[in-house]
Amino acid sequence: AKDFLFMRIQLSEHFTYRKLLRFTLPSVIMMVCTSIYGVVDSVFVSNLVGSDAFAAVNLIMPFLMVLGAVGFMLGTGGSALVAYTLGAGSEKCANEIFSLLIYALIGLGAVFTIGGIAFLTPVSRLLGADETMLPVCVSYGRIVLLGLIPYMLQNTFQSFLVTAERPQLGLYVTIAAGVTNIVLDALFVAVLQWGVEGAALATILSQFVGGAIPLVYFLRPNSSKLRLGRTSFHGRALLKACANGSSEFMTNISMSVVNMLYNWQLMRLMGSGGVAVYGVIMYVNFIFIAIFLGYSMGSAPIVGYHYGAGNRTELRGLLRKSLCIITVMSVVLTAAALLLARPLSLIFVSKEPTLLPVTIRAFSIYSLSFLMVGYNIYASSFFTALNDGFISALISFARTLVFQVAAVTVLPVLWDIDGVWAAVVAAETLALLLSAACLVGKRKKYGYA
């Protein structure tokens, strides 16, 4: 098992099913671990601080995610461009682009940190925080924003470590950051009883670990193809990276906007209890979705490299194998979600008996979306890897914003609270049709079918 996970594989190799799974597995484990650590954070808050505090954290979280979305954009878009450049044989240029993106990210992170703290109170009110939730939103948000730069770096380096053929290091970093978060959560929230401030402090200290380790690795001489150093200003490359990663940026922005809309609908239909139920579903959803995100992140540099090298035969094989792998994942995860609806709900709302049946029903309906979501995530990532930012962004924008907003606006009128939980199923079904149309329509241009 150790050899399967940690044997070094180069992007230029031919990928069998076994080799593809071996290369992407560290990214899958890394994303799942990241999600689990976030869930542990929420378990501490919901069980030890209370459901009102849990609802307040969930209310402000979309705003914090919007500010951190730039890290995902430059990470996925930049790594696709760097992988393409490496595949074309320009290692020096690839390193200059890599360095430029990291330095730009740090500068933007500083601006967003200052702006985020300045506008935190009015934004919390805008998101619907009442007088009870407002101070919790603000105190949690201010602390978390202090760790925005390392959070953005951590997200960016997750993609670049795969491009540097070091996905295992990304896994080690994630484990180190996650263990830090869990240990400090237990200390600050359970032992010292610092409440949501303790949870926020544990979060940012773990993000410093996650951002600092890869930063030091790339600043020092290393055996990978990437290293931070002097750079030239590649304006076109910077714009290209942003365009490539615009789908991931749009996904994070859209998810945050949609979460706000869900919270608004649930506050209207159920009050703060509805927001708490949605929070439970979202945290469990993060773990399941992380498997698809991890596979897409791990396979994207391979696609980008072989596209840059002009190897269309390998490109066709990668797409075919990936769709087969995602089909198996989708069926297994949907079955697991339906079987585990009750035990997973109990983890969060065991002390809230009135919320338990609502949470179980909501999760059972929501779980059907796992049949479609993997294909949509992969299709968007596939086009990002091909440096087609427009199609990638189109799929992401439609999936995470247009279809979801339409569904969560219309379906509750027809089915009341069940309509809220079914909205994501409807949105993912529509997105699957769009993804299929894009893959078929672009097959001759990119030569993958």
Model regions and ranges:
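N-terminal transmembrane alpha-helices
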Residues: 12-49, 62-77, 81, 106-113, ...
